[in-house]
Amino acid sequence: MSWQQRVDDALTARRATDTLRRRYVVSQGAGRWLVANGRQYLNFSSNDYLGLSQHPQIIRAWQQAATRFGVGSGGSGHISGYSVAHRALEEELAQWLGYPRALLFISGFAANQAVITALMKKNDRIVADRLSHASLLEAANLSPAQLRRFIHNDTQHLSRLLQSPCVGQQLVVTEGVYSMDGDSAPLAEIQHIARRHHAWLLVDDAHGIGVTGDEGRGTCWQRGVKPELLVVTFGKGFGVSGAAVLCSESVADYLLQFARHLVYSTSMPPAQAQALSASLAVIRSDEGRERREKLAALVQRFRAGVNASRFTLLNAHSAIQPLIVGDNSRALRLAEALRQQGCWATAIRPPTVPVGTARLRLTLTQAHEACDIDRLLEVLHGAGE
């Protein structure tokens, strides 16, 4: 088989099963409205849960820092790319979340890959929830450690897997809020089981940080859990981009030596770090609390209004509200029907989600109004099959 045939066959297979992904060019993709091809849509696909990507205080912080530092960091943090803005943000994050150290990464994907590849050795075992993010599972598959996956949120299965003999160390991997199902992990029980088996716990709280818990401290804080490794990302609740790993002093020092994604990547721009500090200040303020309360009310309004006889709504109380459709082509048709009625929603299909669970991944944000939720429900019930 030639290179070209390999490429063509893979694309043909995706087209045949209605799983071919595509990108859409938008003029505005975050916030209440999405603008594409000159048309405005109510936006139910954005991860900008608190509406902070458009916050004037955060935009101004980025602009002012860009004037001071320039638009790039100029290098890896190990060379010349670790500025006072980066250090200040790391210290603020560590203090906020109650950890000795925080390390910044350019993305959540990079942070997850870096931690797993740096820590895991040949005789180790990773025990991950089977619905963990692709960045976690890919890193686990590529690492020399053994990967075992437990049934989603099934702590008994997790316990059985941890009980089997392991010569090396064990790492339990889960998420705070799951990106495709919108539900939360039973973190307290997972941590208890991990500690009983002398395993470390890694929690990716990309979709919980900023949005849940006291001062937006996330799912772990809300559940009274402190994992050895906490990954938080800044492209959702923070409204910006990037990520951080919260950990102990010694683990931070270890990652600075052995996390290749950190050592060999250009640091995020200092202006971005400054904007993230401004975003954190909003999240921790009374305004941040009010934004979280508004979002929670919108989620409750949506869930109360969905016709359960026509749609399968998962047990999710986060900003992520998936409607399970099942069939790939039906999910695509439903997404298109919503767009025709002015609501932008995304059909999620395998391999992102398991076969037979194609869905509309609806995301609600603080930028929405109650009338937007009512319009979404009206369109959904009119388009349902």
From Swiss-Prot:
Coiled coil: none annotated. Its EC number is 2.3.1.47. The keyword Plastid does not apply. The modification N6-(pyridoxal phosphate)lysine is found at K236. Pathway: Cofactor biosynthesis; biotin biosynthesis. Substrate binds at R21, H133, T352. Keywords: Biotin biosynthesis, Pyridoxal phosphate, Transferase. Pyridoxal 5'-phosphate binds at G108, F109, S179, H207, T233. It comes from the Bacteria. Homodimer. Catalyzes the decarboxylative condensation of pimeloyl-[acyl-carrier protein] and L-alanine to produce 8-amino-7-oxononanoate (AON), [acyl-carrier protein], and carbon dioxide. This is 8-amino-7-oxononanoate synthase.
